[in-house]
């Protein structure tokens, strides 16, 4: 599929790590350098597109140098190439609430362009324009450093922090956030690329996680001819229900929590540090070696089979067991929210090594009992799941949800490729919810084998929300999707590394396959594993 115009519309042995690096080197190299002077960049200040309420607010040359600071979890401090940065606003207006709205965007046009365009997805409720780098799921080298033209935007509103929902008061701002803004920005970005380089982008890609993952799915569903390759990480599907799920975990864990002077549960007190270690050690004892080697990673979380009831104290509570109250709380938390009649309203969660994570800079592990980032600071002690589920259906997020649409015949028919990835220990959006969508997608599109000819899902053991945790959380899905689109090489595995396990690499395998140690070779090397 060649998306230029912007109109809607078995067992495999892992390649050696060095081969994977060679692929990246080939994909990262510029195809045809385009040398442009400062005047060509400045000239974009007068760019107009008929029928678009567009203002170019700046067009400046940026010399090669270090990257600017980016959002947590996607930091990149390496060098960036010389490029032209274009800043603009689409559809500036005053909303019904008296607030000024407009779709602000930033487009980086590298001097040595490789002919590719990448749309950088957002996060949270957006509301700011992040530096257009394309670092998400790109391993050690972001898209801009590879020669991609990269765009980012605020989806039509400015927010005070990542979860400022005040823009929902304005209908157009809401619709722009949910899906319209990214479609509009794609059209403008492609037009600017065409004007600057005097030729259109040869291939177009979209990469995002969380809200950006939902946005990637939106592109496959509502703009199926805009992009050739999409990478959707931990997609923020059914956001109201995922928040309900986080609250249900907090409520479940509050039953075992200590109380403050007012009788309220103290967040994070249901489990001691020794309890958390006991849980993770027990999960590893039950599930770690199922992949052929005990290495501190659970590569078959779906088939793990851990039961916390095995840790129930026979007598007094001590460091080698959990109280019946704690066990019950964990079981209810991991099962996911249900109504009194037993109806499951959001997916449950998988037993994994990151569910008790306490590392700073990331969301607390699922069982730490913390409140949702968008909920009350003090977790509730009770919950009316039925009422909350009904209330979710009245929120604007439902309009932009991506959990039910599985007819991607146009996207797939044009040769589009769609990669999903999700941290198994994600406390906010259950990995099982993404697995559920992917399996429904396969069912609606001719079965798993047929669907895997254009879409694949990779689960990341130990990883939290988009990054972090006791995980190998650095991997290059950007090269994987480019290689699939442009060379028809499907990603039978993706090599992952991470600071939590220095000197270790492992293959991430397309669901439902999992990584297994072959029993020979270096156990720290991904090349010693196969997906089966």
Where are these regions (language model features)?
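N-terminal signal peptide c-region/cleavage motif recognized by signal peptidases
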Residues: 29-32
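Catalytic-loop region of hydrolases
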Residues: 34-116, 129-138, 280, 293-298, ...
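Cap/lid segment of the alpha/beta-hydrolase catalytic domain
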Residues: 114, 123-198, 244-245, 252, ...
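Alpha/beta-hydrolase fold nucleophile elbow
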Residues: 199-210
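Glycine-rich nucleophile elbow surrounding the catalytic serine of serine-hydrolase chemistry
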Residues: 208-218
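A catalytic-pocket lid/entrance helix-loop region that shapes and gates access to the active site
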Residues: 218-220, 225-338, 459
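Short beta-strand/loop motif that positions the catalytic acidic residue
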Residues: 420-422
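Conserved alpha/beta-hydrolase "acid-adjacent" motif
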Residues: 428-432
